[in-house]
Amino acid sequence: MKYLFLLIVLVYSAVGLANPALDEQASDYQLAKTEQELAAEAVVDKLIMAYNAQNIRQFIELYAEDVEFYMYPQTLMFKGKEKLIERYGLMFKKMHCLKATSIKRVTHGSIVIDHETSEICSKEPGVVDKRSEFVTSYQVEAGKITKVVFFR
């Protein structure tokens, strides 16, 4: 009985893995992003590039004037571009390197949720002294980020 069960599981697994129709369905699903989702992802991609280049002007351009930053679940960290410039402008000036990488992304409508890694060189260029991993949610409306939620 034990061997019969293992044989059934093995055959079922082989059939499932060898079925190209299942692969096509999965890739069709991956390609089925809406224009809104693609546009939201493009904004977040530009944001990550500006962050990594430590280009405060390009970075700030991607945010709405009244952007809100939260720590999950509902703790308001700050609101508005002025506070954003204070916080990130200083960091961009002080750090020798900043590198964020999206390692997994889920997009639904205007919301992009990234599982990200971050590396910072605060003492000398090229020597990473802080690494972190976190999840960030970006809400994008009319090409601007209106809300950011950090999950740590």
Predicted regions and their residues:
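Positively charged n-region of N-terminal signal peptides that target proteins for export
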Residues: 1-4
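Short beta-strand edge/turn micro-motifs at domain boundaries
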Residues: 131-152
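Short, low-complexity N-terminal intrinsically disordered segments enriched in polar/charged residues
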Residues: 18-53, 57, 61
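Short, cysteine-centered beta-strand-loop-beta hairpins and adjacent loop/turn segments enriched
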Residues: 93-95, 120-130
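A solvent-exposed, acidic/Ser-Thr-rich amphipathic alpha-helical stretch
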Residues: 56-107
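A short hydrophobic beta-strand element
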Residues: 109-118
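Short, surface-exposed coil-to-beta transition loops
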Residues: 98-100, 115, 129-135
